[in-house]
A protein has these predicted regions:
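Active-site helical microenvironments for divalent-metal-assisted chemistry
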Residues: 1-179
């Protein structure tokens, strides 16, 4: 039966799944004690959704489902507010697309941009090996964390969601990822 579903129907079903997940996030946020800044959260979601459009996770689900899940952890399990939720929604945009931290700052302001920058890995190539890159990423995370503890809390939410979804990875990738998560 799956073969009979047209590409447009699959895309429509994915869009509905994404919209439902985002609505759940908004409903969760609205149930919190935080001041209600739905507009900025919706703006961050729309921006991230467009930036990750057409990208899939290893599980086959739309990539945007990961930032939504991280934002839900940030909201529901850690109890952070709109700035952190926006940063969670945007946390992979700079790393995985052509957008820059400056773009994020121009659209969402300096605080969200600073947090997103703290969550963005330093790109490889300038460091000789993986261990050096990991050390530099850890150093960057610590320096940013000293300015804003939300960076480490969102990073923990990101790693937590990745660990919860290890079942969709190949066994070799699981080992590589779990060693990264331990770092």
């Amino acid at each position: 039966m799956e073969e009979n579903i047209s590409q447009k129907e699959k895309e429509k079903a994915e869009e509905e799944m994404i919209e439902q997940a985002f609505q759940e996030l908004l409903n969760d946020y609205l149930a919190t004690k935080h001041r209600k800044r739905v507009e900025i959260i919706t703006k961050a979601f729309n921006f991230a959704n467009q930036a990750h459009k057409g990208i899939k996770r290893r599980s086959g689900e739309p990539y945007i489902m990961h930032p939504i899940a991280v934002a839900k952890i940030v909201c529901n399990e850690i109890g952070l507010g709109s700035t952190s939720i926006c940063s969670a929604l945007l946390h992979d945009v700079v790393e995985d697309t052509d957008y820059t931290v400056e773009d994020i700052e121009n659209i969402f302001g300096p605080k969200i941009a600073q947090i997103v920058d703290g969550l963005t890995k330093i790109s490889g190539g300038i460091f000789g090996d993986r261990a050096s890159a990991q050390a530099e990423n850890f150093k960057k995370l610590l320096l940013t964390m000293s300015d804003d503890i939300r960076v480490i809390l969102i990073k923990i939410a990101d790693r937590l969601h990745n660990m919860r979804t290890l079942g969709s990875m190949l066994p070799n990738n699981c080992l590589l990822y779990t060693s990264d998560a331990a770092d």
